[in-house]
Amino acid sequence: MDAEMSEIRIEKGCAGELPDILDFANYVFSQSSQPHDFRRLLPKLYGENSGSEGYHYLVREDGRIRAMVCAMPLSLLVAGKPLRAAGIGTVSVHPYARGKGYMKALMNRAMEDLKTQGYAMAFLGGMRQRYEYFGFTPTGTRASFHLTAGNLAHRYPGLSGDGVSLSPLE
């Protein structure tokens, strides 16, 4: 950590801090893309009385949240046996606090805690190349869909397929 980071606090969120955590996430994500409402998008995590404050690792400067990483515990059932996992998300740094190493510090702290606490795995979405620094690699299933003239003929008799195109969903 550099000299600036030695003057900041890294801590877990506490009960009652959900409004501040939610405001911070909504602000940062809304600044970098479209308007966000995490309470609506993820009600189990950010709904009222969800109790999720403690899943959040926070960097504070002068008491104000400047960066955040959520590590939400999940229990997966694999071959009939429970597997402790964590979903990493809401990774965010205030626009004025970028470049200070806060995301790296929070990700390292969260990953170390998960290892120490016996979690078998963690997963996330988002900018995968960014998270490869922390040991994440793309995995999983990929679905491919093929639409042929025969598919169209059975669903839409008389349609030739000329002029039909598919576009990726965004």
What function would you assign to each model-found segment?
Residues 19, 23-27, 104-112, 116, ...:
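A broad, structural surface signal
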Residues 74-76, 96, 129:
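Short coil/turn motifs at secondary-structure junctions
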